[in-house]
A protein has these predicted regions:
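Bacterial Sec-dependent N-terminal signal peptides
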Residues: 1-21
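Short, surface-exposed coil-to-beta transition loops
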Residues: 34-37, 84, 109-114, 135-139
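Structural motif
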Residues: 37, 46, 122-123
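A mature extracytoplasmic/lumenal domain signature
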Residues: 42-44, 51-53, 118, 128-130, ...
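Edge beta-strand at a domain terminus
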Residues: 121, 130-147
Length: 147
């Protein structure tokens, strides 16, 4: 009976550790250029990221930049503030990475498959790629910050 109780508590501890690990990506991050803040949150079991702030130098005539490069002309007038640029990430505990996601690049108007991992608690590395070829893509570093 003692062994069962010990195994039960070890199982709970292991589950709690994995749960904490999966949510480490949640928070606010500066993009690589430190011009944009992205809030990463968990929604419906997946991780998403939304632009919440851009430095004032990015504004023109007091207006936030628009999604000018979007391939859909109907979306080019929408503000980048509030735009979801990360979508669909799930945590892979074996590889300690968030995978199966996508990232939208407002500079090019393109969406890429993407995965990410934490180099440290304050450094998130993301890699966008096409055609399922992970090694052929572009990497980006994001830095944890506050609102």
């Amino acid at each position: 009976m003692k062994k069962l109780i010990i195994l039960f508590f070890l199982g709970i501890y292991a589950f709690a550790s994995i749960a904490q690990e999966t949510d480490k990506i949640v928070g606010v991050w500066w993009n690589e250029e430190k011009t944009t803040k992205i809030e990463v949150e968990k929604k419906d079991g997946k991780y998403i990221g939304t632009i919440i702030y851009m430095i004032p130098e990015k504004y023109e005539n007091g207006e936030a930049p628009k999604d000018d490069e979007n391939p859909d002309p109907a979306l080019r007038e929408r503000s980048l503030i509030g735009l979801q640029i990360l979508d669909g990430f799930v945590y892979n505990a074996d590889k300690k990475e968030w995978k199966d996601g996508s990232i939208y690049d407002p500079k090019s108007g393109k969406t890429y498959d993407c995965y990410g991992w934490l180099e440290s608690d304050d450094l998130l590395k993301l890699k966008g790629f096409v055609a399922g070829i992970r090694w052929m893509g572009k990497s980006s570093e994001w830095y944890r910050t506050t609102m």
